[in-house]
């Protein structure tokens, strides 16, 4: 089923790309475990990585810091490799509230989650591709370090069907039930099967547009065919087919029985400890909850919160790392960590937060101590599991630089010829008046300005001052949610206002070609917001404009300022030299404003598979407070459908906005009832 990676692009590597590709490939072939690609904004880092994958023909996992950037990368990789398996693996929860206990108020919060069926299917498709093929690129979020079903058990549970094999119909149905497929003769959907005489139709859990028809003659498989579940039209007949489990967490019956005995042993030991410490309530609570889970596992093969018993189900010892997506990646696989200066610290922080919450649950008798082993990987475990790694960032962190021995692959030259901004340092005493005159110059020629301050109070005062002097200005602060933030950025690009003031405007993916000036107030105050890395990221916001300029207001040049200015000058000189040698005139970017709000659109298109155009999704209206319970319930169902539609298109911000509205509506419904 595997094909060689075939790169599809109208462009050939140019600028620094050929040298970067050569050095990365040489490093990988020489066995280097860690390499860092320092690629500035707009230099084509994704294209470079795609070339490395295509040249070396190795299965690859790309880690992104969040779902939105993962969606962007998935869309780009899908365009580069249309004939290969490009997969998407992020958390399948549209909404997730983990179970927790607050001792101070004696409040237990039940686990509550809304699973996105479409993303669950994409996750299953990703692991299937990793097990079956070598031409696979999986774009994943930090969800990749969380526990997943054991690949060995997952492989054991698969159902292999071959034309001519002898198998009883009941045996097939029994195996499908073990794989957690449900029989549904009416509504045929993903993860179900239907039976009509000697014909069994199965809708694979990892597929969104193809189902399998198994035709039996007595106890022999006579024919296997793939068909469109919507139209019923046969697509092709095949000699064999493998049906994967409906979920990553299925376990063979004998393993469940063994796990139940081990759970009973741990329960007995834990009860003894609690009683010795005179914790009678906790002992009773733990016994009741665990016995209920054991009964469910005995009858159904699973229970709510079965992941808390994952240590027993996968046969691991106490403290051993859980199986994750890394266990599905072949030994010669390649790991690419995008925006590594953000992603690496994220990976390091996941374990501690999860541990703190679960320790409280164990202490107060809500869970057995083994629940602590249902966790994300520790950072040292991630390091041990990670294959050869390429870190990609415009501002690599100390960790990446240390791991790659300070030997960084530079990709500074942009094929468009755009130069890094000119940097000026000006005194603090006159910074506000000087900034006002600069803003007026930019506004007169229809260009935009970003201003970063150190404190919320200063940002508010500056915004007020600029408004009083007739400037069109907005203020971006931490209370603004993701969707509104994107709308403010869109309005800035459209020219609804000219100046955006904020405290931390260096978020990755902030892509605004219209911004020609970045002003950094109090640049000489050393700290997190004025570190070398933060300054380079902020200065880079003006790097997509031909007239890009950055003004740093400070009475002295700090070490961080000196390094940031030096690095920007180095990049600028290198680009200028390249432009002169190749006769390139810098070209401004004319990126459509709609792009920034439609990051999930590519994925929705790739998944549509020619089934007609997607309907425009209408935003929900404001809900009157005096609606009847019946009308409220109708509105709740309507918004749930809308939320799922947004989530299916990977428009997570819109889905989250509707989810928050649903919470309010449900509270109103309870009060009205």
Swiss-Prot record:
Transmembrane segments: none
Domain notes: The beta-hairpin motif is involved in DNA binding.
Taxonomic placement: Bacteria, Pseudomonadati, Pseudomonadota, Gammaproteobacteria, Enterobacterales
Positions of the UVR domain: 633-668
Function: The UvrABC repair system catalyzes the recognition and processing of DNA lesions. A damage recognition complex composed of 2 UvrA and 2 UvrB subunits scans DNA for abnormalities. Upon binding of the UvrA(2)B(2) complex to a putative damaged site, the DNA wraps around one UvrB monomer. DNA wrap is dependent on ATP binding by UvrB and probably causes local melting of the DNA helix, facilitating insertion of UvrB beta-hairpin between the DNA strands. Then UvrB probes one DNA strand for the presence of a lesion.
Domain Helicase C-terminal: 431-597
UniProt binding sites for ATP: 39-46
Location of this chain's protein in the cell: Cytoplasm
Domain of life (superkingdom): Bacteria
GO-annotated cellular components: cytoplasm; excinuclease repair complex
Gene3D superfamilies recorded: P-loop containing nucleotide triphosphate hydrolases, UVR domain
Matching Pfam families: Helicase_C (PF00271), ResIII (PF04851), UVR (PF02151), UvrB (PF12344), UvrB_inter (PF17757)
Keyword tags: ATP-binding, Cytoplasm, DNA damage, DNA excision, DNA repair, Excision nuclease, Nucleotide-binding, SOS response
Species annotation: Shigella dysenteriae serotype 1 (strain Sd197)
GO terms for MF: ATP binding; ATP hydrolysis activity; DNA binding; excinuclease ABC activity
Alphabetized PROSITE patterns for the sequence: HELICASE_ATP_BIND_1 (PS51192), HELICASE_CTER (PS51194), UVR (PS50151)
Matching SUPFAM superfamilies: C-terminal UvrC-binding domain of UvrB, P-loop containing nucleoside triphosphate hydrolases
Family: Belongs to the UvrB family.
Gene assigned in the entry: uvrB
Keyword Metal-binding applies: no
Presence of the UniProt keyword ATP-binding in the record: yes
Protein name in the entry: UvrABC system protein B
Listed GO biological process terms: nucleotide-excision repair; SOS response
Summary of subunit composition and partner proteins: Forms a heterotetramer with UvrA during the search for lesions. Interacts with UvrC in an incision complex.
Motif Beta-hairpin, chain ranges: 92-115
Domain Helicase ATP-binding: start-end pairs: 26-414
């Amino acid at each position: 089923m595997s094909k060689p990676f075939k790169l599809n692009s109208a462009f050939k590597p140019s600028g620094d790309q050929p040298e970067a590709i050569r050095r990365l490939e040489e490093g990988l072939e020489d066995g280097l475990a860690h390499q860092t690609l320092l690629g500035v904004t707009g230099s084509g880092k994704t294209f470079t990585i795609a070339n490395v994958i295509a040249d070396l023909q190795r299965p690859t996992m790309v880690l992104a810091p969040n779902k939105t950037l993962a969606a962007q990368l998935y869309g780009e990789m899908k365009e580069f490799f249309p004939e290969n398996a490009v997969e998407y693996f992020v958390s399948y929860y549209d909404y997730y509230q983990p179970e927790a206990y607050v001792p101070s108020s004696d409040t237990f919060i039940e686990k509550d989650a809304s699973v996105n069926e479409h993303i669950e299917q994409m996750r299953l498709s990703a692991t299937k591709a990793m097990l079956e093929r070598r031409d696979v690129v999986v774009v994943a979020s930090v969800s990749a370090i969380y526990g997943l079903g054991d690949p060995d058990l997952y492989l054991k549970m698969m159902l292999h069907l071959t034309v001519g094999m002898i198998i009883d119909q009941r045996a097939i149905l029994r195996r499908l039930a073990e794989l957690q497929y449900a029989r549904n003769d009416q509504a045929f959907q993903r993860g179900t099967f239907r039976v009509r005489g000697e014909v069994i139709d199965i809708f694979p859990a990892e597929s969104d547009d193809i189902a399998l028809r198994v035709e039996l003659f007595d106890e022999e498989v006579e024919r296997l065919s793939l068909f469109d579940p919507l139209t019923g039209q046969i697509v092709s007949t095949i000699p064999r087919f493998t049906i994967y489990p409906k979920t990553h967490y299925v376990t063979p019956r004998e393993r469940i029985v063994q796990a139940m005995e081990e759970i009973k042993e741990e329960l007995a030991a834990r009860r003894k400890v609690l009683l010795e410490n005179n914790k009678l309530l906790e002992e009773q609570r733990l016994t009741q909850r665990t016995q209920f889970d054991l009964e469910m596992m005995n009858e159904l093969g699973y229970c709510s919160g079965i992941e808390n018993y994952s240590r027993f189900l996968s046969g691991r010892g106490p403290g051993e790392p859980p199986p994750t997506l890394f266990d599905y990646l072949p030994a010669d696989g390649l790991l690419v960590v995008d925006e590594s200066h953000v992603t690496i610290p994220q990976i390091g922080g996941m374990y501690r937060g999860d541990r703190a919450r679960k320790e409280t649950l164990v202490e107060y008798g809500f869970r057995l101590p083994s629940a602590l082993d249902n966790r994300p990987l520790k950072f040292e475990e991630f390091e041990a599991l990670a294959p050869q790694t390429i870190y990609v960032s415009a501002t690599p962190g100390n960790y990446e630089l240390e791991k790659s021995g300070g030997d960084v692959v530079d990709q500074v030259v942009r094929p468009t010829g755009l130069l890094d901004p000119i940097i000026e340092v000006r005194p603090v005493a006159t910074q506000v008046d000087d900034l006002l005159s600069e803003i007026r110059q930019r506004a007169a020629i229809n260009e935009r300005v970003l201003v970063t301050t150190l404190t919320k109070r200063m940002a508010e005062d500056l915004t007020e001052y600029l408004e009083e002097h007739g400037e069109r200005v907005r203020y971006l602060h931490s209370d603004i949610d993701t969707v509104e933030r994107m709308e403010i950025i869109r309005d800035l690009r459209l020219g609804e206002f000219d100046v955006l003031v904020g405290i931390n405007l260096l978020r990755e993916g902030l892509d605004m070609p219209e911004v020609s000036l970045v002003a950094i107030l109090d640049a000489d105050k050393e700290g997190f917001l004025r570190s070398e890395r933060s300054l380079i990221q902020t200065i880079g916001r003006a790097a997509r404009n031909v007239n890009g300029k950055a003004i740093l207001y400070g009475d002295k040049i700090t070490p961080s300022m000196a390094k940031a200015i030096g690095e920007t000058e180095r990049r600028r000189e290198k680009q200028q030299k390249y432009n002169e040698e190749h006769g390139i005139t810098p070209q401004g970017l004319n990126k459509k404003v709609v792009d920034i709000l439609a990051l999930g659109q590519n994925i929705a298109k790739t998944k549509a598979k020619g089934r007609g155009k997607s309907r425009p999704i209408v935003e929900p209206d404001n809900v009157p407070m005096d609606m009847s319970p019946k009308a409220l319930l109708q509105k709740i169902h309507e918004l749930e459908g809308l939320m799922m539609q947004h989530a299916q298109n990977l428009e997570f911000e819109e889905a989250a906005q509707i989810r928050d509205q649903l919470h309010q509506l449900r509270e109103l419904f309870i009060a009205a009832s």
